[in-house]
Amino acid sequence: MKSAYRVAVKCLVDLERVEEVAGCSDSSRMTQIWKSIWSIQCPSKVKHFLWRASRNILPTKQCLMCRKIIMEDCCDFCGESESSGHILWSCTIAKETWKEVGINCSILSQTPTEFLDVWFMNNTKGENDWELFATVAWCLWNNRNKVWHGEARKNGKSIAEEARKYWAEV
């Protein structure tokens, strides 16, 4: 029962955060975020992913469970509750991938929960770092989707190699 309560509270907090972000998109800070997302030199699907991640509207298992589409929100890699923060930062596969890529994101050691937390904390990165960062995040999400649809899971090293290759092609 306590677990269901925590999930319900988390869903309400997430919903409030999405509304807060959506409501302040005219502010200078949010305008800067949107401009930086849309100006990154990467494929449109990666930009779209970044936009959805920044608004916390990725269809994670946690979000799908809140909408009563699925019954449990367990991560396919580690069994913990699957939120966007978990998939991108705190899951064992995500940590392994970021370590392999070698991007020095100091916030990642603090286990952030929101995509915008990482964006705000690392907004001084160079353009190439952001493009690689965006590509790695998209590859983590893409790997999650492939596993959810029955494909074999990849380890962090494979995801990092895929991200580097994809980034180099762009």
Please describe what each predicted stretch is:
Residues 1-170:
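A helix-boundary/hinge signal
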